[in-house]
Amino acid sequence: LMDGKIRLNAAAFWQEWDDFQFSRLDTSISPITLTYNVGNAESNGFEFDFTAMLAANWSLSGAASFVDSNLTSDYARNGVDVDAASGTALPRVPETKWNLSTRYGFGDDFFLQAAYMYTGDSYNTLFDGGTISTQRRTQKAYTVVNTAVGMERENWSAQVYVNNLTDERGSVWINAVTWDQRVTINQPRSVGVSFTRSF
């Protein structure tokens, strides 16, 4: 597009599962994770990515995905009482994810870059297990900002970076087992230097 200044890719998808499987750790049954057949499910969505050259030394890129995934049949562990009804959202699948990044070069070799990444809400498990530690909980949306400044030559590059600039603490996963519930968070703010050389 625009004489090669913009590149755009997009895709839509629709997927149906028969005998969808779900992994869950329940220490009242087994000390290891078990896989359950939970019926039928579907996942529909749309995703795209783009890169745009705003100037000879300035680029902008991004990507996004929008997913609707849920059960299409009721699930009952004991065959009678429904634990997850048809229409229940599948776990660990954010409905929305997107990112935006930019890179600006100046002088002959120097560059600045920044990236903004958003992960939407998701659920930690398929159904509520009946105890505090096995509750179905929402893993809240969070954002991460990464920045860097560096130098790039023909066969090497070096940069100083700050990942997770705002020190955002997002819940990557909240477990749902029969002992204490624990939350795994994303990596906190980190500052570093990297060097790359091509041979």
Where are the regions that the model predicts?
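Gram-negative outer-membrane beta-barrel transporters
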Residues: 7-9, 13-16, 34-128, 194-198
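C-terminal beta-signal and adjacent terminal beta-strands/loops
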Residues: 118-128, 150-199
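Short sequence motifs at beta-strands and strand-loop junctions characteristic
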Residues: 2, 38-42, 90-97, 138-143, ...
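Short coil turns and loop connectors of transmembrane beta-barrels in diderm outer membranes
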Residues: 2-4, 18, 54-57, 68, ...
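Short, glycine/charged-rich beta-strand-loop motifs at protein surfaces that mediate ligand recognition
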Residues: 11, 132-139, 145-148, 156, ...
